[in-house]
Design a protein with these regions (language model features):
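PLD/PLD-like phosphodiesterase catalytic module centered on the HKD motif
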Residues: 1-204
Length: 204
């Protein structure tokens, strides 16, 4: 199935196929909590969520935490956790606080994040496994509102949603990446730390 985010939006299709007890695997350059908000109902019902940043993120030499550092982070892909500029314009501070809290609670229960440690290209996309059903999306540059089709994009981009058996080849190497401790590392706690900063920053 072709998805152009005009006649058919990626987010709507993902809501249909992210079923209870699914395992969701994503590889993308950025993760936005506003994209999480759009898929939250479906993501609350899954068993496991694994996300790989396809570019180095949260590297040790970049982390010098200050209370407001998240507002102007060193790395754009880390800033995207709190929304791209167009997403931030859509949300007031109370909404941002609520979403950050919900996302942090969900991450603690369901999600793990890893990042590649070297500047080497790897495949991006989505793989959803539920029993014998496997769905895949062949491209996912960023996990954000624009990529999901909920914010207008200047240029039309196409991606494809596959069912088995065509879906089986996409992100087949994901677990190899996930279990590779030499070139990938777990950053789940760093993601939680950033979300906690956002929540505290917007607390009265």
């Amino acid at each position: 199935m072709e998805i152009d985010n005009r006649s058919r939006r990626l987010g709507d299709e993902l809501k249909k196929i992210i079923l209870p007890h699914s395992q969701v695997k994503m590889a993308a350059a950025t993760f936005s909590l506003y994209a999480f908000k759009e898929l939250r109902e479906a993501l609350e019902e899954i068993d496991e969520f694994k996300f790989i940043f396809t570019n180095p993120a949260f590297m040790v030499d970049e982390i010098k935490e200050q209370y407001r550092e998240y507002a102007i982070p060193k790395a754009e892909r880390e800033m995207a956790l709190f929304g791209a500029s167009y997403e931030l314009k859509l949300m007031n501070e109370l909404t941002q606080k609520a979403i950050a809290k919900e996302c942090a609670e969900w991450v603690r229960r369901k999600a793990r994040f890893k990042t590649i440690k070297v500047d080497e290209p790897i495949s991006d996309g989505v793989r959803i496994e539920c029993g014998s059903n496997v769905f895949s999306v062949d491209r996912l540059k960023n996990f954000d509102l624009k990529e999901l089709g909920y914010e207008a994009s200047t240029l039309k981009t196409r991606r494809n949603l596959y069912e088995a058996p065509n879906s089986l080849d996409y992100l087949a190497e994901f677990e190899d990446y996930w279990n590779d401790n030499e070139y990938f590392r777990d950053i789940t706690q760093e993601v939680l730390d950033k979300l906690n900063i956002a929540y505290k920053e917007h607390s009265p």
